[in-house]
Every structure is written in structure tokens, then in C-alpha cells.
């Protein structure tokens, strides 16, 4: 999220696409009410329709994206929980979005199911299903469509958020220190999920702070490449080069937020 904000601030175009409306996701208010005795429940929450909740979720997503300057937010809409075999047409819809926008970079859910003890997890999950549908749509967008004059489009690079991986699988970090407050603000937009200012701040402190600690900065976001890239020569980022010449005290000050 902060990474997208950084790119928008530098003139790049960012589009956020949500497969579903989030109708059956994180309805914490309904969950809270149903946990109460029947005579103590808030009837307005109990009677809330899926369409009403969907509108609330969409508004929250748009508000969170607006924090980072993202105005192109698209909600495709599909059956929930999303399963490709139930809504295969979604792949074509995603392909059409790709052909319209023609992005150079795709950041999507990880298609790899998290496992324990090296065991294979074959259960279906919204996140991995969206990842597989998106990657299939990306591949379809790069091939000609019979009966159409639309030029195929091949996305140059695909990345997955590091939150779905172990630290030794990260390919690079984006320093998000200057965007910490924006991340908290965006996180706090999801009121329907029970988020509060205190919870949002603590969550970002722990997640971006943990990534920042291991990357040598205060707050960071991590990414995993789908595949290795071909480069014209070996390059070193400005951050990496600068830090190779600094004393230990500077490193500690930066992690403490006293120096950037």
C-alpha cells in the first residue's frame, strides 16, 4: 500500500482491482451481535442486507486507497467466497481490465498456499483463488483474441506481497518509513472489520516494523518476484550503497526513527 503511494507521488499510475465486494469477509459487527444473547442484539445490525454491507466495504476500500492518492479503484464483483470453478467468467473480466490499463507491473496475491512442516495444502482459499485467476487473466491478455483487433499486452513484471512468505524468500524491501502514518490511516478506514486507531497503529507497527527491523530501516514493505529478471548490468540501490558506508550508530538511529 505504501509502495503504491510512493509511485503515485512520483507520477506513476496505479489501479486497484478488487475481485469481490467483501460481503462475507470480516463482518465483525454481525459477528459481535450474534455472540450476544438474542434479547441483547442490535436489530439494525442483524437486519443489514448483504448489499448494504457490500456498499460499506466498497466505500472503505476507496477511502483507504484515497489515502495513497489512488483514485482508480475497480470492484468487479463475483460470488463469495470466490472459487474459480463457480465463477470462471471472472478471469475474462480481469483480462479485459489488463488490456484496458496495459500495466507494466502487476502486484497480486500469492498463488502459493502457506503450509506447516512442509506439508502441501490443497484446500481452496479466497486469496490463492484470486491469485490463480489473476495470473490466468494476465496470461490470456498476452495472447491474441480471435475476432478482436485489441493488441495483446504482456505485463513486464509480477510481484507478490512479502507478507505471504518467509523472510528468506523476500527479494527486495521498499522503505515505507515516511508513509507510516498513511498506512495507519488507511488501515483505520476499515471500521466494519472492527479496526480502531489503536489497533491500526499497533498492527502497522508490528508488521511494517518487523519487516523494517530485518531490512535495516524503521518501517518497510517486502516483495517477492515471480521470476528472476534479466538486467543489463549489476546494480545496487542508493539505499544499499549508502548503508554500506555508514557506522553502526547510524544504523541504530535509523531503526529508531531518529535518522532516515
Task: Please tell me what each predicted stretch does.
Residues 72, 80-260:
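Metal-dependent de-N-acetylase/amidase catalytic core
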